[in-house]
């Protein structure tokens, strides 16, 4: 993704979905997981920027898919073979199940990735096969080519770095901050901040997080971004928010300080620190390593603070260390609890915690997978989709009747004996690491602890 945006920059353009993994994320991977990230409340997901896809299906068909007007759709429906069938059956499914789809799909910016039934037709009523291909994780066909929409790079930008004396306060304040019309709001907890303070990256951002006499210790921050092509408009937005922050500073449930960064050069220093969060957590010492398995849950932003407090209680009850950061405006926080997967007793925590967190996300009308695809976690799909899950199985069967493409992920075709993968029945790195002698593991510690 970074290479694509570097090529677009001389033309004043960019590919919008902003990922913290942008220096290694591929466009194909973004399409197959329907990736999103910072600024998604304004810019949406990858699907929103895909104009057309060229796909190769198992019967050898090569097909260009894009938004279709009604007459175009009706013409395609008349075709024989897979393409005609898929367009006929998918449109019929959407028509017959629309009320169930509307009720089942939560009102989230992230949506239910992996056969996104809610967007088979767009706001204009156009049918678009890409709604199920984007986020399909390669389970329906092979994406060979994509035509992408690109946007103009905003001329002016500002980042307001707001400090709080508790992480809960930062989350509860984020919903109110959205009323001030920012481009995005990112949050970082004290665990990640303290790790950043011990890293070389802190030298580039230290001045934006000053330690003033009499101030409480920073336990959480919200990074509020504004962008605009009009400098006066941008400054007016910043001035309105900072005036509000001055008025409420120190009040219960509010922030106690802030700084303002102006211009892409300065702002990118702070985003660089935020993007380094996973690496900072991965550099922690000891046998317990941060493990991604409940790392991208999503709930409606108004439920986020209550949900996260219960989520943290689950992790605290297991005595686990963790840090949290993410897209608080979209209701998505990333967390990787530290677990020694070489220890069989700790390995079992993956199942126990995932079951608890899955139940929590349903309690708060959210998702277990809000950003990084379903993968092995697809075993929870039937519980989330309910009566719609058999419809996903039908879709899988149209494209992949013999379960050959990324089997066990998202949905299985309606075949006897074919099941989704289960999170505790797949081989883990910890199981492999147990085979390495202790002295060898100690001698090559840097390699063993590398998280990629």
Role assignments for model-derived ranges:
Residues 48, 128, 134, 140, ...:
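Active-site capping/gating regions of soluble enzymes
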Residues 150, 164-166, 226-232, 301-303, ...:
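A generic structural motif
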Residues 1-174, 402-412, 416-446:
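FAD-binding subdomain of flavoenzyme oxidoreductases
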Residues 157-162, 218-228, 287-297, 333-343, ...:
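Short, hydrophobic beta-strand segments
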Residues 65-68, 72-73, 146-151, 171-288, ...:
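Terminal amphipathic helices with adjacent charged low-complexity linkers/tails
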């Amino acid at each position: 993704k970074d290479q694509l945006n570097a090529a677009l920059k001389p033309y004043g353009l960019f590919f919008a979905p902003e990922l913290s993994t942008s220096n290694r994320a591929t466009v194909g991977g973004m399409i197959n997981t329907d990736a999103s990230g910072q600024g998604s409340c304004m810019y949406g997901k990858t699907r929103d920027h895909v104009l057309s896809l060229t796909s190769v299906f198992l019967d050898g068909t090569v097909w260009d898919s894009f938004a279709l007007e009604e007459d175009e759709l009706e013409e395609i429906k008349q075709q024989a073979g897979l393409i005609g069938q898929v367009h006929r059956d998918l449109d019929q499914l959407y028509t017959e199940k629309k009320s169930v789809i509307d009720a089942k799909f939560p009102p989230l910016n992230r949506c239910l990735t992996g056969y996104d039934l809610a967007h088979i037709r767009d706001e204009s009523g156009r049918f678009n096969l890409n709604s199920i291909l984007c986020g399909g994780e390669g389970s329906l066909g092979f994406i060979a080519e994509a035509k992408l929409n690109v946007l103009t790079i905003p001329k002016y930008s500002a980042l307001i770095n707001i400090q709080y004396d508790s992480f809960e306060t930062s989350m509860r304040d984020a919903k109110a901050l959205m009323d001030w019309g920012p481009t995005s709001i990112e949050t970082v907890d004290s665990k990640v901040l303290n790790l950043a303070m011990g890293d070389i990256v802190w030298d580039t951002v230290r001045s934006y997080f000053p330690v003033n006499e009499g101030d409480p210790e920073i336990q959480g921050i919200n990074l509020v971004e504004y962008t605009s092509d009009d400098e006066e408009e941008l400054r007016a937005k910043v001035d309105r928010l900072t005036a509000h922050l001055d008025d409420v500073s120190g009040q219960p449930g509010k922030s106690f300080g802030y700084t303002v960064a102006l211009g892409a050069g300065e702002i990118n220093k702070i985003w660089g620190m935020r993007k380094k969060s996973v690496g900072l957590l991965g550099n922690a010492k000891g046998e317990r390593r941060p493990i991604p398995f409940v790392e991208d849950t999503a709930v409606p932003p108004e439920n986020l603070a209550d949900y996260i407090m219960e989520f943290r209680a689950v992790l605290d009850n297991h005595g686990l260390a963790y840090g949290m950061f993410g897209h608080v405006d979209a209701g998505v926080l990333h967390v990787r609890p530290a677990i020694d997967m070489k220890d069989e007793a700790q390995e079992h925590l993956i199942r126990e915690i995932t079951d608890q967190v899955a139940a929590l996300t349903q309690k708060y009308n959210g998702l277990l997978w809000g950003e990084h695809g379903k993968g092995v976690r697809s075993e929870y799909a039937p519980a989330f989709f309910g009566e719609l899950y058999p419809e996903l199985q039908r879709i899988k069967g149209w494209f992949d009747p013999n379960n050959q493409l990324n089997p066990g992920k998202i949905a299985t075709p309606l075949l006897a004996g074919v099941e989704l993968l289960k999170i505790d029945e797949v081989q883990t790195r910890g199981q492999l690491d147990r085979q390495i002698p202790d002295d060898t593991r100690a001698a090559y510690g840097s390699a063993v602890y590398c998280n990629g």
